[in-house]
C-alpha cells in the first residue's frame, strides 16, 4: 500500500510559499514527497534510522491481531498525491530529507517516551 507523506517542516514550508503569492491565488497545491513508497519500504527506512537490524516479515496469519485489523481495510486504493504543481509553479522542494525527518521524529518519540 502506498501513501504520500511529508515531514512537518517541509509541509509548513510549502504552505508558507502559497501565502500572499499571486501565483497561488485560487489554486490547489498538494504537498508531499516526490516518489511515495509502499509501507514495507517505510518500515525498512524507520528500522534503519532506529538502528534495528531485524527481519520484517509480511504475514496474513489470522491469529495475529494486526493482520486481523488490516483485513478489514481496502488497501487496493493507493493514497498517492502528485506534488508537481507546487514544485514547478512555486519552486517548492524539501529542505529536510526523508532520512533526517525520520531521524528527528524518532528522537522526538524517544524523548517523549
Locations of regions flagged by a protein language model:
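Glycine-rich "substrate-gating" loop/helix at the edge of Rossmann-like oxidoreductase active sites
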Residues: 1-9, 33-35
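Amphipathic alpha-helical segment in the mid-to-C-terminal domain
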Residues: 8, 39, 94-98
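Conserved C-terminal active-site "lid" loop/helix of NAD(P)H-dependent oxidoreductases
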Residues: 8, 64-93
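Non-catalytic, hydrophobic alpha-helical segments
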Residues: 11, 15, 31, 42, ...
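Mid/C-terminal beta-alpha module of Rossmann-like enzyme folds, strongest
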Residues: 14-71
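Residues within well-ordered alpha-helical secondary structure of globular protein domains
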Residues: 17, 48, 92, 107-108
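Amphipathic terminal alpha-helices
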Residues: 97-113
Amino acid at each position: 500500500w502506498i501513501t504520500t507523506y511529508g515531514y512537518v517542516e517541509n509541509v509548513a514550508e510549502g504552505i508558507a510559499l502559497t501565502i500572499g503569492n499571486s501565483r497561488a491565488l485560487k489554486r490547489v497545491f498538494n504537498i508531499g514527497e516526490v516518489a511515495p513508497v509502499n509501507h514495507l519500504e517505510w518500515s525498512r527506512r524507520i528500522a534503519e534510522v532506529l538502528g534495528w537490524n531485524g527481519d520484517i516479515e509480511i504475514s496474513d496469519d489470522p491469529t495475529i491481531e494486526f493482520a486481523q485489523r488490516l483485513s478489514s481495510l481496502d488497501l487496493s486504493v493507493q493514497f498517492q498525491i502528485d506534488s508537481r504543481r507546487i514544485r514547478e509553479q512555486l519552486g517548492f522542494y524539501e529542505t529536510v530529507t526523508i532520512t533526517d525527518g525520520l531521524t528527528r521524529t524518532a528522537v522526538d518519540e524517544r524523548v517523549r517516551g
